[in-house]
Regions:
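Compositionally biased terminal segments of proteins
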Residues: 1-191
């Protein structure tokens, strides 16, 4: 997504997402590639990811249409009950994945979110620390690259918070390699 048309579509999607969050008083924040690009190395992405602290996917779907969003699969509500992800599409054609937050950590993500102004567009995004935590759990190559980009750009990270949450999730999931991978990355950057 590097041509002006697709950048404009992404911007329009984010603008409507912010209007939706504010208009419906949703506890929400942008996460994923958009947020990682704003906190770290800029990169383009094909979709927008957000976390909304809500259990009511039906109410979200009902209000989404007023802001230019529709479900992108036929059984979106059933899918969201099984996966806690609501799959939407903006009228511009950009896909939006809404994670339905329920964990205390997800509540913290939205409560700690920051507003960043990009060319007059105020975007509510997860903090750099919370993005690193989420991306450490995902463990995909692009997530590891995003972590590196965030660490390289952000020089006032709360590394204790990052270590605490990744250690907690690593323990609960019985996957010590999650914490070990993060620790190697932090040590390489002398954090």
């Amino acid at each position: 997504m590097s041509d002006p048309k697709t950048i404009a579509q992404l911007r329009a999607t984010i603008a409507d997402l912010m209007r939706w969050f504010e208009g419906e008083d949703l506890r929400a924040a942008v996460i994923g590639g958009v947020a990682a690009g704003l906190h770290g190395r800029p990169r383009l992405t094909k979709d927008v990811d957000a976390v909304v602290f809500s259990d009511d996917a039906a109410a979200l779907v009902a209000s989404a249409g007023s802001y230019g969003f529709a479900t992108r699969i036929d059984d979106a509500l059933d899918f969201s009950r099984r996966t806690r992800v609501l799959l939407l599409r903006h009228h511009s054609g950009v896909d939006v994945d809404i994670s339905l937050g329920a964990l205390s950590f997800e509540a913290e993500i939205v409560d700690r979110a920051q507003v960043i102004d990009i060319g007059g567009l105020a975007i509510r995004i997860a903090t750099p620390e919370d993005l690193i935590i989420m991306k450490a759990l995902a463990r995909r190559p692009e997530d590891i690259a995003d972590i590196g980009g965030i660490i390289d750009v952000q020089h006032q990270l709360d590394v204790d918070r990052i270590r605490f949450w990744v250690r907690e999730f690593s323990s609960v999931l019985e996957m010590p390699e999650i914490f070990e991978d993060l620790e190697r990355l932090l040590q390489r950057r002398k954090l």
